[in-house]
Amino acid sequence: MQKLTILGATGSIGASTLKVIEQNPDKFSVVALAADSNVEKMQQLCQRWQPEFAVMANKEAALRLKMALAVLAPNTQVLGGQEALCYVATLEQVDSVMAAIVGAAGLVPTMAAVKAGKRILLANKEALVMSGQLFIDEVEKSGAQLLPVDSEHNAIFQCLPQAVQGNLGRCDLASQGVSHILLTGSGGPFRYTDVAELEAVTPEQAIAHPNWSMGPKISVDSATMMNKGLEYIEAKWLFNANRDQLKVIIHPQSVIHSMVQYLDGSVLAQMGEPDMATPIALTLSYPERVKAGVKPLDFTQVGELTFLQPDFERYPCLALAIEACYLGQHATTTLNAANEVAVAAFLARQIKFTDIARVNDSVLNQVCKQSLASGLDSLESLLELDRMARTLADEVVRERAQ
């Protein structure tokens, strides 16, 4: 029986993880559920799963949850704050940690789980975007096992040889016959919208993703293709890929979730319904397979599969992310922070959709001019840079909002 802590239990990844566990009650059990502030949802989950621990990052929310669970789940211990997230991520009885807290907030507890040598089911791409080499080094040092949950990275993982699967972050793709990793993306809801009309896009339009069901932040990132940019950075670290080995392709149908091209001309593609339960099930059970509760792909209903080159005029955030990836750790940490601030401002109707890329570009330029590339060798230094970039992004947002 594999025992789990789920960080980000009230989000869409948390829901899909619990769906897979429900399909396989004899294989997995929930020790701890953790979230930010959604007390109502957490209350329902605790009532259903009766975990040993329930954690709310927001301490006020933790107090409200504690009162609510006194009768509904009296055996569940309720904890609050960032330290509590790290505590349940490192519990001795826990085998695996689903790292699904959105954004920079997920980095510290995910890193704590890595240092504790856990099996890390990595759904929080920002952890690698923000800490890159530091993260990979800690995985190697602690002997933690890293398994990618993101559908694209999970697809790539499945298409790679076992020698690479067991050596993420350190592998040599060329020695295993790999020529290219092809990262696919749908292009979001605006791939055919006139570029001039993007300025007027509303938050409601931006979060209506054509293929996937996701939270608001990642839905906006998919619309700008920043999500693909962050995935590009994550893929660079996970698969130790260089610029020539990593390519982004637009695939509107989201049937193929990514591909690996080999030196002999072969291309392996992983296909399936756009349902996160599939990659989650694989990370939970790897190297075995378990039921995920996902209907099989019906090829007679698939229709055509199309592929396009990304248009960087339409997706300036994707271009920024690829550029940041090769500028260094200071650039990717900065870009991630600026983007989180910009997306929140757009969702709050403070800036336009097209301002997201402008905020990101402005903050990235300001930080790169300050020569902050050195000295980012600790979690504290990265978090300090993250805070600085957010402050700069707030200033740019205020300017653009006027």
Curated annotation (Swiss-Prot):
The keyword Manganese applies. Its cofactor is Mg(2+); Mn(2+). GO terms for biological process: isopentenyl diphosphate biosynthetic process, methylerythritol 4-phosphate pathway involved in terpenoid biosynthetic process. Pfam families: DXP_redisom_C (PF08436), DXP_reductoisom (PF02670), DXPR_C (PF13288). NADPH binds at residues 10-13, 38, 124, 126, 215. It catalyses: 2-C-methyl-D-erythritol 4-phosphate + NADP(+) = 1-deoxy-D-xylulose 5-phosphate + NADPH + H(+). Its EC number is 1.1.1.267. It is an enzyme of class 1 (oxidoreductase). Mn(2+) binds at residues 150, 152, 231. Gene3D superfamilies: 1.10.1740.10, NAD(P)-binding Rossmann-like Domain. GO terms for molecular function: 1-deoxy-D-xylulose-5-phosphate reductoisomerase activity; manganese ion binding; NADPH binding. Pathway: Isoprenoid biosynthesis; isopentenyl diphosphate biosynthesis via DXP pathway; isopentenyl diphosphate from 1-deoxy-D-xylulose 5-phosphate: step 1/6. Keywords: Isoprene biosynthesis, Manganese, Metal-binding, NADP, Oxidoreductase. 1-deoxy-D-xylulose 5-phosphate binds at residues 125, 151-152, 186, 209, 222, 227-228, 231. Belongs to the DXR family. Catalyzes the NADPH-dependent rearrangement and reduction of 1-deoxy-D-xylulose-5-phosphate (DXP) to 2-C-methyl-D-erythritol 4-phosphate (MEP). This is 1-deoxy-D-xylulose 5-phosphate reductoisomerase. It comes from Vibrio vulnificus (strain YJ016). The lineage of its organism: Bacteria, Pseudomonadati, Pseudomonadota, Gammaproteobacteria, Vibrionales.
